[in-house]
Amino acid sequence: MNRLLFLFVCLISIASFGQNTYQIAILKYNGGGDWYANPTALPNLISFSNENIGTNIKKEPATVEVGSSDIFNYPFLHMTGHGNVVLNSSETENLRNYLLAGGFLHIDDNYGMDPYVRTEIKKVFPEIDLVELPTNHPIFHGKYEFKNGLPKIHKHDASPSQAFGIVIDGRLVLLYTYESDIGDGWEDAEVHNDSEQIRLKALQMGANILEYVFTN
C-alpha cells in the first residue's frame, strides 16, 4: 500500500470509527529484545475495546517487521519488550515515513527497555524531543477517566508511571508508556495474577489509547 493510500485509509477509519473492520499490528524489531512479550495482551485489549468502545478491530493482531513496507497496512502499531532495541538506517527511515504519513506507534516499556528505545526514537526523530503528556491530555479523558494520568499497573520500583509522546504539527504520532507496565495488565489474568481491578484499569486505559488514535 503506498503512503498516500495509507493516509487515505487512516482518514476513512477515523471518520467511520466502529464501522470499518481494520487490523492493528505488533512491531517486530532487532537487537535481542523480546518484541514478542505479552502474547495475550493485544488480543485481550482488542476484545475489550470492541465490546466497550465500539471499535471493530480484527480479533488477532498482525506481526510486522519495522523495516517492512507492510507497516503501511496498519494504522496502529504496538511495540514492547524488556531489553535491547536496534534500528538500522532503513528501518529508521521506514518508521519515520510511516508516522509522518498518518500512522501511530505505541511503545510500552515492559521494564528494561527504556535506555535502548529512547536512543532509537531519537534516531527516528532527531529534531524532536519526547515530551511528557500532562494529566489533562485528552488521551486520559476519553471513554474512561484517568484524572491522574497513566495508571501504575506493576510496581517494580517507586518511580511514577509516565506517558511521553512525539507530537508533530499538533498530532500525537508516538506514545511511549513508561514505568506503568500497562501491557502486562492486558494479559490473561493467570499470567501475572493481577486483580480484576488492576486488569480493568489497564484495559480501560488501553481502550482510551485506541479511541484517541482512531478519533483524532
Q: In which residue ranges do the predicted regions lie?
A:
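Short alpha-beta junction capping motif
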Residues: 24, 76-115
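An acidic, glycine-rich "communication" segment
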Residues: 22-23, 28-32, 40-41, 114-190, ...
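Aromatic-Pro/Gly-enriched surface loop or interdomain linker
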Residues: 18-76, 80-83, 173, 179-182, ...
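Sec-dependent N-terminal signal peptides
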Residues: 4-15
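Alpha-helical scaffolding within the catalytic cores
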Residues: 59-66, 83, 88-93, 158-162
